[in-house]
Amino acid sequence: GCFGITILMLAVYYIIHVLFITESYIETFTASAQNTAVYSTSICNNDCIEPGASITGANKVEYDPVILANKKSLVVNRLTDRAKDLINVIKMTFYYTDTQTLFNKENDLVLEDILYNFDIYKLKQALNPGDSINLFFTVKNKPNTMIRNNSSVVSNGTFFNNSAFPSFGYSGRELTDDKTREKYDLPPNKLKPFPSDSTALGNTYISKDADWIDFEATVSTSKDQIAIAPGYLQKEWIEGDRRYFNYKMDSKILNFYAFNSGKYEVAKDKWNDVNLEIYYHKDHDYNLDRMMKGMKAALDYCSTNFSPYQHKQLRIIEFPRTAGGFAQSFPNTVPFSEDIGFIAKVDDSEEGGNDYSFFVTVHEVAHQWWAHQVIGADVLGSTMLSESLSEYVSLKVIEQVNGKKKMRKFLKRSLDEYLTSRTFERKRENALMYNDGQGYIHYQKGSLIFYALSDYIGEKTLNNALSKYVKKVAFQEPPYTTSIDMVNHVKEVTPDSLNYLIKDMFETITLYQNRVVETKSKKLDNGKYQVDIEFKVSKYRNNEKGRIFYGEEERDSITYQTDDMKKPEYSVFLEDYIDVGIFGEDNDEKEIELYLKKLKISSIHNKISIIVDQEPIEVGIDPYNKLIDTNSEDNRMKIEK
């Protein structure tokens, strides 16, 4: 197995050929990019060939200096008139300390930050528009030890991505905590730029040093292993004790890719004309059927509702939990930790937890649309376009499989995790469409918001708006799309009566305090039951620091107070449609819906009576937890007999 393996004296060597060619019109950011990346990579442990013997390649980097000077941030002097004319400074960031670089043009190393692996080179002769410069580089990592994990290269199950290679430009890895910054006389860090920042719109939030690239990789590994990279296998051969694989992508991809190597078994299937494969450790076959089912379900949902799938294959590749408990979606390739799917013991009973081997698979496949077709600019809110919408797809697919009535535990889990995580926020919490990239916002809150929105305006209506949005921005060149673009597409299909949802869900931080106060029922002469419900609904907003307010102006809020109340209760002005539900039991004592309808609520305090055909057991206000309610435990109440 892959548990607790300790590997001594491991190293990885990369021989990389890279060609980037960019043409653009910088003033309007209507750039068209043609970038080619060809990689030759060796994955070795201590029985690898001699390091010198594996260094056989060169790296060529050709940029249009106009793009680099402005859009790619490779020039220290940011004066616009000068930046358009030449490049005289190159910035480079390294992941591994032992990274050796060599340019083919004379330069001086003017800054070497050995703590954060950031160098600045000044060219002795500046690059004019149309000039090119070659870069040769070799990357090594330190060997793993008994107490320190330095390398992602292991004896079985290697996984690393392109962050291991040098990157160009300013990385933006700055101190984020304002109190820490204050100690160094630094101003508060604003993190991501606003969507109005024209420079930031020239980059995706995934990569600042390239746009869409043509990708080809040759990877060597141990003779008994399979090496995998994005693209389609073109050639495989053995040379000495090394096994080689050549992959090539047939369409442009983001500058975002990974390499895997392991002693894999391979499970195969098909979805329409798409080849499906799962590369797994021999003893970890517990949930292959669930993961294969998840791939098919996600491909079905996304291709039906948004746009066609852009590749002819889709692969999941297992890696050891020592690299982390996550999955990551690259073009047609999804590295997937053993820890979150392959070795899970799934409880399919009513009381069981979520089938996360299926759920995570759907989420990662959804990224083939929401990240690899639609990619946001490097601005606030862009992770809503990738993570929130992928989570939304997961919830809708689970709803198709399990039915709407079983969605409460999924929604409540997301709600509770969001509410808990936001209490630990140290910097600021923005509204969803302007989030800073915090996981609890774009995962937990985002999934709730989009699921609720599909419930309010209709799943088909929402998906049609998203499909229209995909058609507009998929695979686009700079300037890249933003959350504002997507929200505008949703606004177009939202009825006037529900316009408040746009403000509550996307533009502000809005929370509810809904609760059932009292309920009782009585049997009528005709055999039906009258259910009386007293309940309260209120909502408020938070600013980025968590301060509560009830409206932009005094008249925007409403109050409720009785004679025996010391203080009134407040709410933002209400014209809200909220689910009211009444529930009974079937012959097996399982919950069934007797009544579920959205009622328009305009007051904090409410009393209603509803007639149902069967004996009621429980009532609920927003009973399925679709809204962001600060205490969902009081949304339901057993009926007083």
Feature annotation, model-predicted:
Residues L8-V76, T80-A83, L498-D504:
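N-terminal, polar/Ser/Thr-rich
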Residues F29, V38-N46, D64, K71, ...:
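Extended, low-hydrophobicity, Ser/Thr/Pro/Gly-biased non-transmembrane segments
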Residues L86-I87, M92-F160, N203-T204, L599-E615, ...:
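A surface-exposed beta-strand-loop module
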Residues N88, D98-F103, A229, N499, ...:
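Beta-strand-rich binding/interaction modules
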Residues K296, Y301, D347-K409, L466:
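Zinc-dependent metallopeptidase catalytic helix centered on the HExxH motif
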Residues Q310, G439-Q530:
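Amphipathic alpha-helical substructures
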